Swiss-Prot record:
Keywords: ATP-binding, Cytoplasm, Kinase, Magnesium, Metal-binding, Nucleotide metabolism, Nucleotide-binding, Phosphoprotein, Transferase. One of its GO terms (biological process) is UTP biosynthetic process. It comes from Shewanella sp. (strain W3-18-1). NCBIfam families: PRK00668.1. One of its GO terms (cellular component) is cytoplasm. It is an enzyme of class 2 (transferase). This is Nucleoside diphosphate kinase. Belongs to the NDK family. It catalyses: a 2'-deoxyribonucleoside 5'-diphosphate + ATP = a 2'-deoxyribonucleoside 5'-triphosphate + ADP; a ribonucleoside 5'-diphosphate + ATP = a ribonucleoside 5'-triphosphate + ADP. CDD domains: NDPk_I (cd04413). ATP binds at residues 11, 59, 87, 93, 104, 114. Its cofactor is Mg(2+).
């Protein structure tokens, strides 16, 4: 098993409903360690930059508007096969299709406001982590 880092966002809908602590509990119960975290209110430019790969898709404007609608929590999680483990905890992108007990099944209302984001691969995790965190902000958990 490989120790990896992955990037995670708790989106404005879940922050507004005070689900941060419950979601962090899910991460930690699954064996993922939080090695960096901060609350941000994204600017339009930050959201457009982060989601640039979707800029030509029809939902881009709505996505940017949603992600700038309120504060978010961004965090870096570390653990064995962290990318896959985190995505399993999140559940399907569409909460209507997410397995019971997953974050999206329990905390999301719709595919558009689906509570959380998780990197889909080690490579995208590295890119997404670097977008929000400097190397100095990452705190390895050795105990």
């Amino acid at each position: 098993m490989a120790i990896e880092r992955t990037f995670s966002i708790i989106k404005p809908d879940a922050v507004a409903k005070n689900h941060i602590g419950a979601i962090y509990n899910r991460f930690e119960t699954a064996g993922l360690k939080i090695v960096a975290a901060k609350m941000l209110h994204l600017t339009k430019e930050q959201a457009e930059g982060f989601y640039a790969e979707h800029s030509e898709r029809g939902f881009f404007g709505a996505l940017v508007a949603f992600m700038t609608s309120g504060p978010i929590m961004v965090q870096v999680l570390e653990g064995e096969n962290a990318v896959l483990a985190h995505r399993e905890i999140l559940g399907a992108t569409n909460p209507a299709q997410a397995a019971p007990g997953t974050i999206r099944a329990d905390f999301a209302e719709s595919i558009d406001e689906n509570a959380a984001h998780g990197s889909d691969a080690v490579e995208s995790a590295a890119r997404e982590i670097a977008y929000f965190f400097s190397a100095e902000e990452l705190c390895p958990r050795t105990r």
